[in-house]
Amino acid sequence: MKPLKDTELIITKEKKIYHLNLEKKQIADDIILVGDQDRVSQISKYFNSIEHKVQHREFVTHTGTYKGKKISVISSGIGCDNIDIVINELDALVNIDFNTKIINSNKKKLNFFRLGTSGSLQEDILVDTYLVSEYAIGFEGLAHFYRESEHIEQQMTEAFIKHSQWPKKLAEPYIVKASTRSCTKILWKSSF
């Protein structure tokens, strides 16, 4: 496999991923993603210990332990473009050798938990209600830029497009199902 070009993998002189300003050792396998920077400390204050606190631009990272388990909380800022940067850079941290710029043959998977605010269409769901979503819908078309679109719920997406009379001039929406394993972790607190 050929090394990635400098424009494909932007790292600092200190071998940190550029936007997040992080090293591999500074993140956990379980990562809570929040939009707002202030939410990072609101969550990490419940950690038993904090080993790393890093901030670069709107990206704030706290990594520590909670009940003996290593966990990170990272702010992405607002919008799917920022979340895309965060997830791609975290993936690079664990799946690319920064010295050779070659993608590892054995890829590591991280567990992401998105924690944020949402509107509701149901009257019985009040403001500030905690929810765990089984599905998410994207309107910006970002998922279509990635090869692995098997995660898109095609039948549900097509039904939504038809029902909403989605305009063809807009990016095609997509619906994805949350990881059953992740939902179970959150609902039953088996790991946290």
Residue ranges, per PLM feature:
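Metabolite-binding pocket within alpha/beta catalytic cores that recognizes anionic/polar moieties
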Residues: 2-175
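Active-site-adjacent substrate-binding region
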Residues: 179-192
